[in-house]
Amino acid sequence: MSEPKVRRWVGKYEVGRLIGECNFGKLRSAVDTETGDPVALMILDKDKVLKHKMAEQIKREISIMKLINHPNVVQLYEVLASKAKIYIVLEFISGGKLFDKIKNDGRMNEDEAQRYFQQLINAVDYCHSRGVYHRDLKPENLLLDAQENLKVAEFGLIALSQQAGGDGLRHTACGNPDYAAPEVLNDQGYDGAKADLWSCGVILFVLLAGYLPFEDSSLTTLYKKISSADFSCPPWLSSGVKNLIVRILDPNPMTRITIPEILEDVWFKKDYKPAVFEEKKEANLADVEAVFKDSEEGRVQLRSFPCVICSGGTTCGDVRSRTKLMNGLIERGRPQEAHSIFNTLIEEGHKPSLITYTTLVTALTRQKHFHSLLSLISKVEKNGLKPDTILFNAIINASSESGNLDQAMKIFEKMKESGCKPTASTFNTLIKGYGKIGKLEESSRLLDMMLRDEMLQPNDRTCNILVQAWCNQRKIEEAWNIVYKMQSYGVKPDVVTFNTLAKAYARIGSTCTAEDMIIPRMLHNKVKPNVRTCGTIVNGYCEEGKMEEALRFFYRMKELGVHPNLFVFNSLIKGFLNINDMDGVGEVVDLMEEFGVKPDVVTFSTLMNAWSSVGDMKRCEEIYTDMLEGGIDPDIHAFSILAKGYARAGEPEKAEQILNQMRKFGVRPNVVIYTQIISGWCSAGEMKKAMQVYKKMCGIVGLSPNLTTYETLIWGFGEAKQPWKAEELLKDMEGKNVVPTRKTMQLIADGWKSIGVSNSNDANTLGSSFSTSSKLNIPNNIASSRSPLFLKGMPEKPKLCIKSQFGLRQTLLVVLCRDQIGEAGRFCKFM
């Protein structure tokens, strides 16, 4: 057995995993072995610091942090040094960056943003009172502890008040321009306190809006916007916070609000709690110089050895606690971090337990890292552990998830050879795996093995897995045979079984069979239909265009004791839209209000798509506005509908503006939306702008174009009588690993034909000539027909005249598209 990797120590601190890196060193986690408390250890390379003449800045940073003792500022505990390294021991902050919280969760409500802003002002006010100015405040430099309290970090750019010029102003520009005050960018000297306050205002705006107040791809334009405070607050902010933001983001530092004035602001004072802490006495800064002295005094020694407890065959506390942490991270959707913790355990010389290995398998499965699963069993055995049933089941499940059933069966056989008895869960996993890849005969063989060889009783999960597998193959009769077979073993079908069968009937266009057969059998077996059962049947009728049947069953739901949910109403709306019956849509939305079901983004998107498809972007915009006023954030699908609609309506500039809207709501554009915008510009004959969008997508955004993107551009160049440019795109396609099809080549050929070239040799000659000659007068902006991307399946405009408007009442969508309908409407006959 190979020797475990050593554990490293700096003084009393046991060094852990790498957290981050910079030009001059690394940041690692560590543990104070005397107290057991976690710390962060900044390890700086002394030679690099001296070589780059950074010694004074490092001394200044240490001096500043020694001056500060505040609950909302990262604390410095101790500074140590060896001959080659400087060790700065800092408070360990476990909650991550405020920037990541905004990126992952989006904008905050005012109460949450207010709490963070109050803590930020507390910290900044304290630092300013000590003569310390940050000058680089931004969400990336604000950390959150385990209780989600804010901690200001990153003191590398701080300037002490003693370093001001003769005019009392600072003259060193630093920090992120997005958060920098106008006077900092203008480099005319500035007051550090007022500059920090501007940054606080930008941070408050970002917390509440989810995007920056000043944005532009051009740095010159961005500076102009910042210098003139050219921004607007989003409509959802209260007047109190709007007024405060405007007073903070005052471009004139002389009239800008001050911290004492902020502390008296009505919005700020709500639930305000001043920081409580013990004031630090004047720090002794004399020892800071000793950090760079080349003497043996005070140097720390590194020591290393494997974990004694683990080597003795007992699981140590570190392994137990970190395994628990791994489980927590996996549950929160962070398997990569769990995997990293496992690697750290190995690096530190610990011996993981079987539970730790099982947790690792779960993390690998979530990350879809399946290649090392088979070798994992050998590693467990080499560590002197015997794999148990739980570990085998986890590895079999991972192999099955990857689609590698051969590997799963090898592990299954190894499981039996090792003396571990397979469980019902083992067989269910294998049966499901073979069912997913369509090998149902193998699933049946495993069921027989389960019953015959292992004497195991199948359960309801076994039944549902097999029923689902046969239904996926559209072999409903075989699925029923499974139900009957399971009943003979005492396994009764449950609501999941019947829902699967109902969905299978609806999928083949036999929703009436689903209703006539499934519902009676459910009631006979004393299985209560749920909203999913009813939703499947309603949606099935809607998909088949049988709206009267859908409505009839909608009212039958009351008899079954099932309350309709949003899926049911969205299905009805979509069904009526598919047959161009806007009156039906209006009454369904009224029913939503009657049943107390609020619309969601799918509801709005469905209605937006209906109007967008017929070219009525005004109606589409009205619904979009209603959605925003109702407090519902649009998703990628809603934005895609807008972009596609504008492009199809010949308004590509509006389609491109959608990208700004998406950024405000924290929605990342995908290749589909960019392709729709490109298609709009191609249809307008604006190939230069189409290529600008294409380059932005590939370069700045980092998205990979797909075949549709390239074929849209090729079609556009063909319509613009520039087929040589279309042909040049083939090189881009090769570079992006996008394989052209017969259709791609036909589009290029059509482009050449449009300028009278049908021979490939002539095309090559002309292409070379066009790309090198400036004398040929070929217009770039030629009026063209719509792109093929938007001609597919365009519905005819509905004949019904819509007289009413879309609007909101009490945050519910109230669409009132009645056109000569009675008071009760057509639904009265079903009441």
Curated annotation (Swiss-Prot):
Residue stretches of each PPR repeat: 318-352, 353-387, 388-422, 423-457, 459-493, 494-529, 530-564, 565-599, 600-634, 635-669, 670-705, 706-740
Keyword flag Repeat: yes
GO molecular function, one term: protein kinase activity
Gene3D superfamilies given in the database record: Tetratricopeptide repeat domain (1.25.40.10), Transferase(Phosphotransferase) domain 1 (1.10.510.10)
Sorted UniProt keywords: Repeat
Name of a matching Pfam family: PPR_2
Organism domain of life: Eukaryota
Location of the Protein kinase domain: 13-268
NCBIfam families: PPR
PANTHER family, sorted: OS01G0228400 PROTEIN
Protein name: Pentatricopeptide repeat-containing protein At5g21222
Species whose genome carries this gene: Arabidopsis thaliana (Mouse-ear cress)
Phylogenetic placement of the source organism: Eukaryota, Viridiplantae, Streptophyta, Embryophyta, Tracheophyta
Underlying gene: ATC401
